[in-house]
């Protein structure tokens, strides 16, 4: 079902956790390079940039995410080398000009330095400047989130507002007194791919209600008491192609070639067929209700933004499959210069929806362990849902009981009495309790 390119990527993974993490990491990195792709969602056009965070304890393998970087590294390297060449030409031209002579061989301003990657230790001003240099495009990638967490705490480095605004392509601007500088990025297109420990995630998004958290889809790698095979015989291998870094770098060169052909075709619009739209809406409407009922009403923003993320994943999958299948997209470019329309396939729709179903569980888990989260967990760190609390209460009640009895049981378990009263009424409506007489109940 996966596009062939992604099958090749996942063929280099060594565990199920690796496969899930590498799939989302690859989709996120590639999303940062698809600024010529849009799709309509909630009556507006959006680009497919994703935000992704891998949470795991130290030594649990989250560092494998670094190989996803290699898939877009050739694009970054080309941008950087081209910028360095322009800067070299600028400096040489400026040096060769004669004093007092009006020189037209070079521009008065130095060329902008363009890159794909934006360092996590950048100041807020530097992030805006680099996005501006890149035409609004950028990828924040780091396998050690503490670098970003530390810079966000500093007065000059807090660009959390930039992260939140860029998610919805909201304009961001910068004004500095020096040189009377003013920069505005009307439509930032930022992707973020990070990994870190639970403590690093909590530093990045210290509160459950923080708008940053609901924008980031999380994947949690659980602790496993195991040791992988790490030593293998490698005599006579071509190391450039045999090592994981080498194989992913080769995949990066392949992706760069296909993307260049893709860009020669112009710009693209991803369309979700009408028959899938109703299914999408119903799926997330039900998920929203279940999560709000079982976890917390604070999770509604997470579900809504997860739905948006799943739509963006559909856009990325569709674009990758198009690159796999169409070698000369420029032949499809409309004569009027409008966007090439690509319909999302059933496979890519189903894959994205399945990814969303996995991510909601991981994101809920991460949410439940945030400081000040309203979600209850047991001694093993597992989430205690509203349904399990209700079942626990019902099991603790005798076959026949009155209001005073369930009030006492409620207080013993630490549940608000008003909440327990609602649960009792729910069980009556469901036919699991009979309201036999005033203030008296019987299990059925």
Question: Model-found features: residue ranges?
Answer:
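Phosphate-handling catalytic cores of nucleic-acid transaction enzymes
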Residues: 1-444
